[in-house]
Regions:
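HotDog/MaoC-like acyl-thioester-processing domains
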Residues: 1-15, 99, 103-160
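Hot-dog-fold acyl-thioester-processing enzymes
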Residues: 1-99
């Protein structure tokens, strides 16, 4: 019988929210600086930095680019929960990035406070040429202070 990497600890983490963070209020300046950095050396689209232009756009105000991350410059570093135990060279400790998918919903606007929470939504195993592989799918969900969904990301980690 082949080993299993899905422990009771992994099963207990399924659908349990962890690593909850709240951003400080997002400012127009935060959005503008992010857009300049992302689009450099080109000029970013006006909806990200020109309040007059943005007021007459479909959004009605300045909005952040999809990739904007209000958690990118934390004051205090936090260690995220490591699923599946330590990373090393032994079987079950090796990790591959299995990719991610992101869906965007309501745009981030100046004044928004973003809440991020992560949960393990699926854990399964397959046997491949590397032997037993455990697939862990985590969901990172962002909402704003009104409870509106901003972004949902699904990340796959593979342990073998």
């Amino acid at each position: 019988m082949s080993p299993t990497y899905i422990t009771q600890d992994i099963r207990n983490m399924l659908q349990v929210e962890r690593d909850v963070m709240l951003s400080p209020p997002v400012s127009e300046s935060d959005i503008r600086k992010w857009a300049i950095a992302v689009y450099w050396p080109d000029t970013p689209p006006r909806q990200f930095w020109d309040a007059d232009y943005a007021r007459n756009s479909r959004w009605g105000s300045i909005v952040a680019p999809h990739e904007f991350n209000p958690f990118a410059w934390p004051i205090e570093r936090r260690e995220a929960t490591r699923l599946g135990g330590p990373i090393g060279k032994e079987p079950g400790q090796r990790v591959l990035n299995g990719g991610s998918t992101i869906r965007y919903y309501t745009p981030i606007r100046p004044g928004d406070v973003i809440r991020s929470g992560t949960k393990l939504v699926e854990a399964y195993e397959k046997t491949g040429r590397l032997g037993v592989m455990m697939f862990l799918i985590s969901e990172i969900a962002w909402t704003n202070q009104r409870g509106e969904r901003v972004k949902v990301e699904h990340k796959t980690s593979i342990r073998y």
